Amino acid sequence: MARIPDTIVLRRDRDLGPRQNDIWVRRGLFGLICVVPVLALLNVFGQRPETSIGSAAAAQLSVSAPSRVRGGLLYQARFDITPRKKLDQAELVLAPGWIHDLTINTMEPSPTSETSQDGKLGLDLGPIAAGQTYVLFIDYQVNPTNVGSQDQTVTLYDGNRALVTLHRTLMVFP
């Protein structure tokens, strides 16, 4: 059997001597580290899209996008607009939470024009025939410095008349 080096004291280094409870602290910290990936797999930190649907006499608006995201995440928001009667000047107005500290990578199909309305993003979609579904996709990336909760209200207008409003909240984790 090999001789124990002079600098190793078995009672202290192998048996933990007076620090026997320290092993439970180390195991507890290791357990906490292991919990984070499990919570991510259970979608606690987001990424899976949630669908919100709002309906009125004139139109139905559906939004499918994650409500919880992490910094650096790439994701897509889908807006489905189905008018029950023709919309002459369809406009989608997005609250500041749709653009604040989020990078818009692409928007398809491109709106006919974009405007700013008191910090909100207005997307002019043009006319939409009754019964026809207009689908708008916006691809995002979450800026790493963005943390916290943001209002992501969406309102569908026909001209100056608000048709449908959906209230959503986006939670951004570090």
Where do the protein language model's features map onto the residues?
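A eukaryote-biased signal for short, well-structured alpha-helical docking elements
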Residues: A2-I4, R12-A56
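Short extracytoplasmic
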Residues: A57-P96
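Hydrophobic beta-strand positions in extracellular immunoglobulin-like domains
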Residues: I81-P83, Y140, L156
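Short aromatic-acidic-glycine turn motif
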Residues: G97-E114, R161-A162
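Extracellular adhesion/glycan-binding regions together with long Ser/Thr-
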Residues: Q117-G131
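Low-complexity, intrinsically disordered segments enriched in Ser/Thr together with acidic residues
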Residues: A129-V147
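Serine/threonine-enriched low-complexity regions used as flexible
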Residues: N146-N160
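Short beta-strand edge segments in extracellular beta-sheet folds
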Residues: T169-P174
